[in-house]
């Protein structure tokens, strides 16, 4: 059996259905003596570019070990599920069980409750960029006139 990494993006209106979808896809893999090495729900995230006029979507990552028939059935399910906007299947050399960088990033930062919080922290970050030790004066300010 081969190892695969699968990422699929779910329509944001179907976020409540993600757990049922992952359960269904997990059953496809394990039903044919496959294994799931890692299953991560990254949650609703901003898309890099709009897909079907949507700017946010729900991301899910799976690292699995399965045969070709199971993989074909998974891909068939992805293609004919209207809730899945995009999917990507990559063949891996071996199983990956460590948390992905997306999950590590989420643990190191406190979660933001809304978009307003990120707007409020942006000016604070800009203010802290100018440290007291830096010389940020213009030439008019730095050259005293007699």
Curated annotation (Swiss-Prot):
Superkingdom of origin: Bacteria
One GO CC term, this protein: cytosolic small ribosomal subunit
GO BP: any one term: translation
Protein name, UniProt field: Small ribosomal subunit protein bS6
Ranges of biased composition (kind: Basic and acidic residues): 106-115, 134-146
Pfam families membership: Ribosomal_S6
Keywords: Ribonucleoprotein, Ribosomal protein, RNA-binding, rRNA-binding
Disordered: annotated segments: 94-146
HAMAP family linked to this entry: Ribosomal_bS6
InterPro entries per record: Ribosomal_bS6, Ribosomal_bS6_sf, Ribosomal_S6_plastid/chlpt, Transl_elong_EF1B/ribsomal_bS6
GO function terms (MF aspect): small ribosomal subunit rRNA binding; structural constituent of ribosome
CDD domains documented for this protein: bS6
Function: Binds together with bS18 to 16S ribosomal RNA.
Keyword Metal-binding annotated: no
Similarity section: Belongs to the bacterial ribosomal protein bS6 family.
């Amino acid at each position: 059996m081969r190892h695969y990494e699968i990422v699929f993006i779910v329509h944001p209106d179907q976020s409540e259905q993600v757990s049922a979808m992952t359960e269904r896809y997990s059953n496809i893999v394990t039903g044919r003596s496959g294994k799931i090495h890692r299953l991560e729900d990254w949650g609703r995230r901003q898309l890099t570019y709009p897909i079907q006029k949507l700017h946010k979507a729900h991301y899910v990552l799976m690292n699995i070990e399965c045969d070709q028939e199971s993989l074909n059935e998974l891909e068939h399910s992805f293609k004919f599920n209207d809730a899945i906007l995009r999917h990507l299947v990559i063949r891996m050399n071996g199983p990956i069980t460590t948390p992905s960088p997306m999950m590590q990033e989420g643990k190191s930062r406190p979660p933001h409750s809304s978009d307003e919080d990120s707007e409020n922290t942006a000016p604070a970050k800009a203010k802290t960029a100018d440290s007291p030790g830096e010389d940020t004066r213009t030439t008019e300010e730095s050259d005293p006139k007699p």
